[in-house]
Amino acid sequence: SLIELTKMVFQETGKNPVTYYTLYGCNCGVGRRGKPKDATDRCCFVHRCCYKKLTGCDPKKDRYSYSWENKAIVCGEKNPCLKELCECDKAVAICLRKNLGTYDKNYRFTMKFLCDKPEKC
């Protein structure tokens, strides 16, 4: 769910995901789509593509379990869809951490009309 995703992103980046990423670029945040503006925005694009592959669970609402062990996210689900959901969220959290250096304040609060048509997953 969005709860676990928010926690993971904070644990990996140290940033408040609601204020730092919600309207970043063309792909970060619920319902946003467009050609990625930079590597940070691409993390969100790839995350959306990961969600599209899920069948049998709702990425926004379904809760899953994970742990934070030695500064690493460990997905602990037995349900296959929830395990994949956890792995999607883990991947975006790690991607955002690895790309903190590409974060461009000019892409915060990007309006949809400034986004080009998205590429395919």
Swiss-Prot record:
Does the UniProt entry include the keyword Hydrolase? no
Q: Does the keyword DNA-binding feature in the UniProt annotation?
A: no
* Keyword terms: Disulfide bond, Myotoxin, Secreted, Toxin
Name the PROSITE patterns on file.
PA2_ASP (PS00119), PA2_HIS (PS00118)
Kindly list the cysteine pairs connected by disulfide bridges: 26-115, 28-44, 43-95, 49-121, 50-88, 57-81, 75-86
User: What domain of life does the native source organism fall in?
Assistant: Eukaryota
- Pfam families from the entry? Phospholip_A2_1 (PF00068)
The terms under GO molecular function for this entry are: calcium ion binding; calcium-dependent phospholipase A2 activity; phospholipid binding; toxin activity
Q: In which tissues is it expressed?
A: Expressed by the venom gland.
Q: Where does it localize?
A: Secreted
* GO biological process terms, semicolon-separated: arachidonate secretion; lipid catabolic process; negative regulation of T cell proliferation; phospholipid metabolic process
Query: Gene3D superfamilies annotated for this entry?
Result: Phospholipase A2 domain
Describe the protein's quaternary organization and the partners it interacts with: Homodimer.
Q: Which family does it belong to?
A: Belongs to the phospholipase A2 family. Group II subfamily. R49 sub-subfamily.
* PANTHER family listed in its UniProt record: PHOSPHOLIPASE A2 FAMILY MEMBER (PTHR11716), PHOSPHOLIPASE A2, MEMBRANE ASSOCIATED (PTHR11716:SF9)
Name by which UniProt lists this protein? Basic phospholipase A2 homolog zhaoermiatoxin
